[in-house]
């Protein structure tokens, strides 16, 4: 299983989303929609072995965590507007500590970014932090890693506190490129590497 977790620093946390202005008034929700697209969509199918989390910290009710489970997703289209409509439906509900299903394969809760990562770590999963200054991807051998979790930052990135937390729990830093990439592009590159190991 491949899992991706992104901290969306400004992404809205309620259902008041302007579908015509995802980058602006919705706190770069366009970025999250593109990440969902990259995480799951193939030419004529969906990736069933992938889970994607967006932990939103924008106004008015942070945090709200969204979880997309590839094996359960239905009726989701690859365009940003369609994905945003499904996100809007989830964000229109009251989040609690319990994961609740909004639509098929899409869940919401008020879990914190660190809380979700720690849960993965405690369940024995290998944590990787995608970072410009990490070790080159080609230096890692994923053949024996069946359950991997990749941490991403949005356009703002992770805070120093977040990075210290990741270091404390033993997350390994991986660099995908000498250039700074968009989060959705990082997801595609990771998929490509892992696809070739099958």
Swiss-Prot record:
Please give one Pfam family short name.
Methyltrn_RNA_2
- The EC number(s) this enzyme carries: 2.1.1.257
**Biological process terms in GO annotation:** tRNA methylation
Q: Where in the cell is it found?
A: Cytoplasm
List the InterPro entries hit by this protein, alphabetically.
Answer: Alpha/beta_knot_MTases, TrmY, tRNA_m1G_MTases_N
Q: Which residues form a coiled coil?
A: none
- GO terms assigned for molecular function: S-adenosylmethionine-dependent methyltransferase activity; tRNA methyltransferase activity
- Binding positions for S-adenosyl-L-methionine? 130, 153, 176-181, 186
Give a yes or no for keyword tRNA processing in this entry: yes
Going by the entry's taxonomy, the superkingdom of the source organism is recorded as Archaea
Q: List the keywords (alphabetical).
A: Cytoplasm, Methyltransferase, S-adenosyl-L-methionine, Transferase, tRNA processing
Q: Which SUPFAM superfamilies match?
A: alpha/beta knot (SSF75217)
Its GO CC terms are: cytoplasm
Main EC class the enzyme belongs to: transferase
Record keyword Kinase present? no
Main function = Specifically catalyzes the N1-methylation of pseudouridine at position 54 (Psi54) in tRNAs.
- Family to which this protein belongs: Belongs to the methyltransferase superfamily. TrmY family.
- Name under which the protein is recorded: tRNA (pseudouridine(54)-N(1))-methyltransferase
Q: What gene is this protein a product of? A: trmY
């Amino acid at each position: 299983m491949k899992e991706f977790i992104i901290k969306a620093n400004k992404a809205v946390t309620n259902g008041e989303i302007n579908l015509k202005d995802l980058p602006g008034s919705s706190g770069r929700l366009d970025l999250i929609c593109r990440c969902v697209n990259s995480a799951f969509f193939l030419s004529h199918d969906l990736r069933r072995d992938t889970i994607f989390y967006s932990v939103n910290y924008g106004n008015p009710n942070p945090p709200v965590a969204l979880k997309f489970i590839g094996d359960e997703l239905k009726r989701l289209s690859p365009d940003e507007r369609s994905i945003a409509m499904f996100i809007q439906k989830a964000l229109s509900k009251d989040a609690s500590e319990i994961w609740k299903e909004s639509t098929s394969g899409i869940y919401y809760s008020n879990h914190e970014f660190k809380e979700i990562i720690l849960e993965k770590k405690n369940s024995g999963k290998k944590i990787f932090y995608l970072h410009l200054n990490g070790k080159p991807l080609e230096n890692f051998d994923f053949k024996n890693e069946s359950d991997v979790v990749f941490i991403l930052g949005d356009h703002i990135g992770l805070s120093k506190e977040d990075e210290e937390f990741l270091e404390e729990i033993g997350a390994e830093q991986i660099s995908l490129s000498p250039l700074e990439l968009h989060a959705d592009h990082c997801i595609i590159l990771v998929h490509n590497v892992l696809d070739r190991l099958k």
